[in-house]
Amino acid sequence: MEDVEIKPRGYQLRLVDHLTKSNGIVYLPTGSGKTFVAILVLKRFSQDFDKPIESGGKRALFMCNTVELARQQAMAVRRCTNFKVGFYVGEQGVDDWTRGMWSDEIKKNQVLVGTAQVFLDMVTQTYVALSSLSVVIIDECHHGTGHHPFREFMRLFTIANQTKLPRVVGLTGVLIKGNEITNVATKLKELEITYRGNIITVSDTKEMENVMLYATKPTEVMVSFPHQEQVLTVTRLISAEIEKFYVSLDLMNIGVQPIRRSKSLQCLRDPSKKSFVKQLFNDFLYQMKEYGIYAASIAIISLIVEFDIKRRQAETLSVKLMHRTALTLCEKIRHLLVQKLQDMTYDDDDDNVNTEEVIMNFSTPKVQRFLMSLKVSFADKDPKDICCLVFVERRYTCKCIYGLLLNYIQSTPELRNVLTPQFMVGRNNISPDFESVLERKWQKSAIQQFRDGNANLMICSSVLEEGIDVQACNHVFILDPVKTFNMYVQSKGRARTTEAKFVLFTADKEREKTIQQIYQYRKAHNDIAEYLKDRVLEKTEPELYEIKGHFQDDIDPFTNENGAVLLPNNALAILHRYCQTIPTDAFGFVIPWFHVLQEDERDRIFGVSAKGKHVISINMPVNCMLRDTIYSDPMDNVKTAKISAAFKACKVLYSLGELNERFVPKTLKERVASIADVHFEHWNKYGDSVTATVNKADKSKDRTYKTECPLEFYDALPRVGEICYAYEIFLEPQFESCEYTEHMYLNLQTPRNYAILLRNKLPRLAEMPLFSNQGKLHVRVANAPLEVIIQNSEQLELLHQFHGMVFRDILKIWHPFFVLDRRSKENSYLVVPLILGAGEQKCFDWELMTNFRRLPQSHGSNVQQREQQPAPRPEDFEGKIVTQWYANYDKPMLVTKVHRELTPLSYMEKNQQDKTYYEFTMSKYGNRIGDVVHKDKFMIEVRDLTEQLTFYVHNRGKFNAKSKAKMKVILIPELCFNFNFPGDLWLKLIFLPSILNRMYFLLHAEALRKRFNTYLNLHLLPFNGTDYMPRPLEIDYSLKRNVDPLGNVIPTEDIEEPKSLLEPMPTKSIEASVANLEITEFENPWQKYMEPVDLSRNLLSTYPVELDYYYHFSVGNVCEMNEMDFEDKEYWAKNQFHMPTGNIYGNRTPAKTNANVPALMPSKPTVRGKVKPLLILQKTVSKEHITPAEQGEFLAAITASSAADVFDMERLEILGDSFLKLSATLYLASKYSDWNEGTLTEVKSKLVSNRNLLFCLIDADIPKTLNTIQFTPRYTWLPPGISLPHNVLALWRENPEFAKIIGPHNLRDLALGDEESLVKGNCSDINYNRFVEGCRANGQSFYAGADFSSEVNFCVGLVTIPNKVIADTLEALLGVIVKNYGLQHAFKMLEYFKICRADIDKPLTQLLNLELGGKKMRANVNTTEIDGFLINHYYLEKNLGYTFKDRRYLLQALTHPSYPTNRITGSYQELEFIGDAILDFLISAYIFENNTKMNPGALTDLRSALVNNTTLACICVRHRLHFFILAENAKLSEIISKFVNFQESQGHRVTNYVRILLEEADVQPTPLDLDDELDMTELPHANKCISQEAEKGVPPKGEFNMSTNVDVPKALGDVLEALIAAVYLDCRDLQRTWEVIFNLFEPELQEFTRKVPINHIRQLVEHKHAKPVFSSPIVEGETVMVSCQFTCMEKTIKVYGFGSNKDQAKLSAAKHALQQLSKCDA
C-alpha cells in the first residue's frame, strides 16, 4: 500500500518525547489517534531493527487483545511505516511452529503484531528474549488485570535481567475495565504498577480541549418509552409450549458426546448439545418479550434455519432426533405467531402482515419509539448524509431487528429509498469451521458496504465497541440498556462528527436509574481526568518493591537450567497441547481427566492440614507415559487447585522427557533427535542428520560409487614362468536341431573353446542361461582349470595380441581411445583359444594365435587380379567366415555348406527360378564385379551372424518359415573375401561379452555369500563349505522381459484397453446401504454462484431447498441437486452402481445366506493344524530345514531391474522389506517399551527409511558390486585387460575437478596410433596436451556446464546408482537370508548392517521373545478383574479360533483409547504397532512362497490389498469381533454399525465397492501446519490449497470435522492387528499365529490371488473418461498432500488426498476421485 502521510498533531509529539525517555500508558479518548502515537514510538525505537538479533539487533512487539484488532493494527503499521511487519495469531497455528520457523520470522520481520498469548508463549519458550526487544506496545492495555496474558507478560519482567528491559507503551481509550467505577485512583495506580510506567496524557487544559476537539463530543439524547403491561395470550401459550419442551429435552438420551477442544484449548466447544438448544429458545423468548410479536415472528425463522442445519449436520441419530423435535416446535410457534398477525388483516395472505400498521401494532413500545425516531430523523433525507449505528445487546437481536427494519422500510414510503440496513455481530465461534469462514466473509462485505456508503444503517451487537474501525458516524442509537462504563464511553466514541447525536432508549421505570448511571459514568470520566491532571508528566515511576508485591502469586514459576519459564497459568494449556500429541484415531479424544477429591479422600492423602481446602487429581489419558495420578497442593479455591495440579503434571512430564527444554510437548522430530546418536550416528559421516529436513534437490541426488572388480580378477595378468589357470567355457544348446538352428547347434558343440587365463583360482560358478535367436543355451565355466606355465615373453606377447584382436577386430568393441592394459590391475585376464591336442588333452591353439595377431582387412579384387589368383578350393571355405565385399556392407557370414554340385551357371531355386546365379549376381552388382572368372566352380551356402552381443533375455522376434528360409544364402566363392578364421570359434566369441560380464557379478555374489555365511557361522555346514555346488541360475519367469532383435530390452506393460469399471447393480440391499453411506462430495474451490444464500441476511425468503443446499455446501456436498436426487431409489435401481468387481468369491447372493445365524456365531469353526506351515517359519524353528543361500540368489539380490536381466532383486525385496519392518517393530517395542505408538512409528519409519538403508549399505561397502546398468557391450563396457591411456586415466585420480569437464568427444579425439594403443598404453605428449586443451575449451563451447559423467563413467570405473536401488538391495539381501536361513539368522544380519544395535544382555536373535513391559501393563491383576471387562469373551475366542492363556493381552487388544475405565493394560495402540508388522510379514511370506508366477508389482498390489485397513475392517466385522471393542464414543459406534450394515449387504465380501470407502487416513489426518520441510517455492500454492481446504469446510485444524467423512473406522483394522499381536504374545509361536491369520484371511487369500485387485491409481488412470492429473506432493510436517484433477460429466473436478508419504496421499486422492466417478457414471 502507498504510504499515507498523516501529520502528527502537537500533543502526539510531546507524548512520544516522554515515551522515548520512560515507560508510559498513553490515555487518549477514542478517535484522538493512539495508533499514530504508537507508530511514532516504533520509529523512535527502530535504530537496531535491521541488524540480526545475534549482533545486537532489536525487534518491536505490538500486542493486541483480539484477532481483529491485531489485524487492524498490523495493517496500520504497514501503511504508515517502511518496517517489515509480521502478523501472528493463534488461528494461524503458530502454537505448533518450530524454533526454526520462529527464528526465520524474527529474522525477517522487525515489528511483530499479534495477540497477547502468542507473544507470551514466544518469550516463555525463549524464542526471543526480552533483552532483544526495543519496545513493547500493548493496545487496549486496560485489560491487563487478573490472569490476562497482558499481565502475565509483564510478570516476566520481574524475573528477567533488569538492565536490558524493553520500553513498555500501553495504549487505551478507557482506563478501567468494565464497570469498576469506584476507587478509580487505586485501580489506576495498579495499572501503572503492572506496566511499570505512568499513565500519560496531554499536559494542560488548552491541549486537553484540543484533544476534545479531535475526539468525540456528540449531543446526548434520552428517549424514554412506557413500560408494556399487558401480555398477549399467544405469548403465554408459546412460553408454556417451550417449558414443556424443556422437560422432555432433559429426559432425552443423546449418548456421550465427544468433547471438542477449541484452538487455544482454553475452553471446551460444544460441551452440551442440549444447552445449545435451550439457549436458542431462551434467546427467542427474550426477543419476544423485548421487541414484540412481530419481531418474534422473524426471530423464530432464525431458529428454524439454525435447527434445520444442525439436524442435517447431526453426527448421531439421537442428536438428529433432538433437533428434529426442536424444529417441529418452532414450526408450531411460527404458525401461532403468523395467525395472530393475520388477525389484523382481512385475508390469509402472508404478505399483508408486513405493513407499517401491523409492524407498529405488534411491537413493544421500545421498538415503536425506535421506529418513530428513525422516521423523524431520516424521513426523505439524502441517504449519503446518513451514517447511523444501532447498538443492541445480543447477537440474535441483530438478525431480528435487521429483518424487522427491512420490512418496515419497505412499507414506509418516507424511508424506502433513504435507509439501507446491514448488520454485524461479534464472532463467538472459536472453531475455524466452515460456517465461521463464510460468516467472516459475509461480515467483511457488510462492513465494506457500510464504509462505501452502500449501506447507511448498521445494527451491531455491543461486541463491536473496541477497535473495529467504522468511520465517522452521525447517529448512534443505543437500543438496549448500557451495561458498562466502557460500553458507554466507547459507543459514544463512535459518534464522531461535530453535529452527531447519541440517543439512548430507556423505559419510564428505569429512567431515573439510567440517568443516575450515566451521571456516574460521567463522574468516573472526570475522576480519571482529575487523576491525570494532578500528575501529568511529573509523576514518579513505580518503585521496584511495588512491582514485586503486585505480582506475588500462590505458585512460583519454575525456571529450568536453560532459562525457560513454566508459568503456572500456562500449565493447563500445555497439558492439553501435550494430549494432542498423543496418537489417536478420529474417535479417541484424549484429554486429561480432572477430578475434585471428596473430603475423606483428601484427608486420607493430605491429613488434617488440608481441611477446608480443595485438592484436584489429574489422570492422563490411557496411552500416556505418565500413568500415576497427580494431586494438586491443597488450595483455597478449585481454580488454583486445578492450576497447581496441571503445573505439577507439567513438571513431571518435563522430568520424563515428554516436554522439551522450552516446556513445549516434544515434537516427533525432537524425539527422533534424542535417540539419533544411538541409531543414526552413521548418518553424520555422510553429511546428513536424521532430523535435517530434506531439500528436494538434495534428496534426489544420487551418489556415484567407484566400482570394484572381484578379487579373483584383480592383479591376475599371466606372467612368464608362473603357474596360470585356464578356465574353459562350455556352451551347450538347449534347443532342438532343425534346418534353421542346425549351424548353431553343431558349431557350439565343437571341441574348440575359449578359456580365460589368469593367475588366480576361481570359485565354482553357477551354470548360466543365455538366449540366442535359435533358443536357450547353458554356459558352464569349468570347475577344474587347466594349469599352464608361459615359457617366454614372446608367448606372452602373442597372448596379449590375440586378446586385443578378439575385442578390436572381431567383436569391434573398441573405442579409439582404448589401449591394451598390461598393468595387471582391474579385470586383468586374457581370452585364449583351446584346441584338442594329442591324447585328447586340451591345449592352447598357438597356431591360430600366431596367424591372427590382427584380423586381415577384407578387400575387393578386380577381374585381372582374380585371373592371376589360383582358383578357389572347397576345403578352404568349409566352416570359415567370409564377407561379400561387393555388397555395401562388411557383414561376416558363416559358411555352412559347400555345394560342389552347383556352379554359378546353375539355375536358382524358389522365386528366381528363371535365372542362374551368375545372371542374378551380375544383374545386381555387375558394374562392381566386372565379371566372374571361374564359372565352372562350386557354390557356398552361408548364414548371417547376428550383430547382437547381449544374450541375457529371450528374443521374442517372430520367425516364420519364410524368413527362416531367407536366412539361407548361396554365394559365388570367388566373389567372397575369406578371413580363414574358424567359424565355430567366431560364433562362440559372440557370446563372450555376455558371459564375462555375468561372471564378474557372479564372483561378487559368491563373495557376499561367503561373507554372510561366515558372519552367521554357517560356513561350516556341509552344504555351505568346500563342497558347495552352486545351483544353476534360475530364471524368474514372472518378469516377462521382451527384447528387440538387437537385444535391447522393450519394457513390458500389459496394457489393456481402458474399460468402464461398471458392473450390474447387485441387489436392492446394496443400493439401500449405499444411500446411507454419504460419500461426501467436494468441488473446489467453490465458484461464487455455488455459494449458498447468506441465510441470516435472507431469512424471510429462505426455502427448504436453500437450507438443504446450505447444509450440503457446509459439509462439502455440493452436488447438482436436480441431477442427482439421493432419495430417488428407482433411479438407482435402474442404474448400475459403478465400481469394478468381478465374480468375487463364487456367486453367492449377498446378505441372504446368514440372515438367521445368531450374531455371535463364528463364521466357520477353525480346526488346528490343517494350515500348511510356512517354510520360512520352519527354518526359524529348527536347523534341519535350512537350505543353502544360493550364489544365484545373491546375484539376483545385487541385480536391479534396470539391468534388465531374467532375474532381479524386486521379488526378494518384498520379503526383505516386510522382514525389516517386523524386526524394526519388535526391536523398538522391546527397547523403548514406554514410548507411545506415534513416536515408535516415527522412529521405525526413519529406521527402515531408504536414507538409513542407503547409509547402512554404503557402510557395508556393497554398492560398488551392484549391477544396475543394462549391459550394452559396444557402448558402456570396458572389456578385460583394456583401459584408457594410463596418463589420461591418472587425471581422474590426481585432478578430479578437471576430470569433470572431460567429455566423450574429447576422448574420441584422442586418435591413438597402434604403437600407443597396443604397446605403450600411454598417449604421446603432443596428443596428451592437445587433449587437455580440448577439455579446457569445453567451458567456452556449448558444452559448458554439461554433465558428461553418464557417458564417461564406465571408462574410469565409476557408476551412479539411485539411492532407492541401494536401499532395495539391502532389503533383497535380507530377503535371501530370511528365505533360506529363517528369522533368527536374519535378525543377526541387522547387526551386521548396523540397522539395529543389540543391547548387552539382549542379542538380536532373541527379538521374538519380546516382553511387553513398559509402565502400561499393571502386574498382579486377578482374572476376575480382567473378565469384568471382557463380557462373553469365549465367543470371541471361538470366532478367532484361539483360546488365550493370559487374557490381559486380549483385554489390551480390545481397549480403544476413548475408554478411560480400563487402567489395567492401556489401549490397543502398542499391540496394534506390533500386530501390524507380524501380519504384514506373515502375509508377505505366504504370498512370496505361493505365487512364484506373479510379477513383483502384482505381489505388492496383492499384499497391500490384503493388509490395508479396509480389508482388515471387513474381516473384523465378518468375524463379529467389533462387538467386543471397548470404546465410549457414540460417534464411533454409529459409524461401525453403518459399516457393518453395508458389509452385510455385500455378503461380508471385500468388494470393490468396499475398497473405495474412505478411511481415516484419506481424510486429512493431522493439521496442516507450515513446517520447515516445505519447499519455499511451493509455499504460496500450499497455503492456497490449505486455505481452500478451510473454506471448503475441511477445517485445517484438529478433529473438528475429520470424522464426519469416514466410512471405514480405523479402529476395526487396528483391533484386528492388536488381536494378532495378542495371539502371538500369548502363544509365542509364529506358526500358530499364522494359522489364526490364515483362517481369518483365507477367503481373501484365495480370491485376491486369483484376481489381484488393481490399486486405485491404476483404476483411475484406466477409467475411460477421467484423464486424471496428479499434482506434485506438498509436504507439511508429517503430512503430504497431493491433489488430483479429473473429468467427470464434462466438468473438471479437483480433489485432495492426504497421507504420511507421497504414495499414500496419491492413493487417497485417487480414492476420492473414484468415489466421485462412481456417482457420475451411474
Swiss-Prot record:
In ovary (at protein level). Changing residue 943 to A: Decreased siRNA length fidelity. Abundance of 21-nucleotide siRNAs produced by the enzyme is decreased whereas the abundance of both 20- and 22-nucleotide siRNAs is increased. However, has no effect on RNA cleavage rates. PROSITE patterns: DICER_DSRBF, DS_RBD, HELICASE_ATP_BIND_1, HELICASE_CTER, PAZ, RNASE_3_2. Residues 366-536 form the Helicase C-terminal domain. Changing residue 943 to E: Decreased siRNA length fidelity. Abundance of 21-nucleotide siRNAs produced by the enzyme is decreased whereas the abundance of both 20- and 22-nucleotide siRNAs is increased. However, has no effect on RNA cleavage rates. Residues 15-193 form the Helicase ATP-binding domain. Changing residue 1476 to A: Unable to unwind blunt termini (BLT) dsRNAs and fails to rescue loss of RNA silencing activity in mutants. No effect on binding to BLT or 3' overhanging (3'ovr) termini dsRNAs. This is Endoribonuclease Dcr-2. It comes from Drosophila melanogaster (Fruit fly). Residues 1520-1609 are annotated as: RNase III insertion domain b. Activity towards dsRNAs such as hairpin dsRNAs, short dsRNAs and microRNAs, is inhibited by inorganic phosphate. Binding to inorganic phosphate may function in substrate discrimination by blocking the enzyme from binding to nonphysiological substrates, as the presence of inorganic phosphate at physiological concentrations inhibits processing of the inappropriate substrates microRNAs (pre-miRNAs) and short dsRNAs but does not affect cleavage of long dsRNAs. Changing residue 1237 to A: No effect on RNAi silencing activity. It is found in: Nucleus; Cytoplasm; Cytoplasm, Cytoplasmic ribonucleoprotein granule. Its EC number is 3.1.26.3. Changing residue 34 to A: ATPase-defective. Unable to unwind blunt termini (BLT) dsRNAs but is able to bind BLT dsRNAs. No effect on binding to 3' overhanging (3'ovr) termini but abolishes binding to BLT dsRNAs. Residues 1697-1719 form the DRBM domain. The gene is Dcr-2. Component of the siRNA-directed RISC loading complex (siRLC), composed of at least Dcr-2, r2d2 and Taf11, which processes dsRNAs into duplex siRNAs which they then load onto AGO2 to initiate formation of the RNA-induced silencing complex (siRISC). The Dcr-2-r2d2 complex exists as a heterodimer and heterotetramer, with the latter showing higher siRNA binding activity. Interacts (via N-terminus) with the siRISC loading cofactor r2d2; interaction is essential for formation of the siRLC and consequently, formation of the siRISC. Interacts with Taf11. Keywords: ATP-binding, Cytoplasm, Helicase, Hydrolase, Nuclease, Nucleotide-binding, Nucleus, RNA-binding, RNA-mediated gene silencing. Residues 713-855 are annotated as: Platform domain. Belongs to the helicase family. Dicer subfamily. When in complex with loqs isoform PD (loqs-PD), undergoes significant conformational changes during the full ATP-dependent dicing reaction cycle for processing a 50 bp dsRNA with a 3' two-nucleotide overhang and a 5' monophosphate terminus. At the initial dsRNA binding stage, the helicase and DUF283 domains transition from an extended to a closed conformation, this anchors the bound dsRNA through major and minor groove recognition and forms the ATP- and 5'-phosphate binding pockets required for dicing activity. Changing residue 1210 to V: No effect on RNAi silencing activity. Gene3D superfamilies: 3.30.160.20, Dicer dimerisation domain (3.30.160.380), P-loop containing nucleotide triphosphate hydrolases (3.40.50.300), paz domain (2.170.260.10), Ribonuclease III domain (1.10.1520.10).
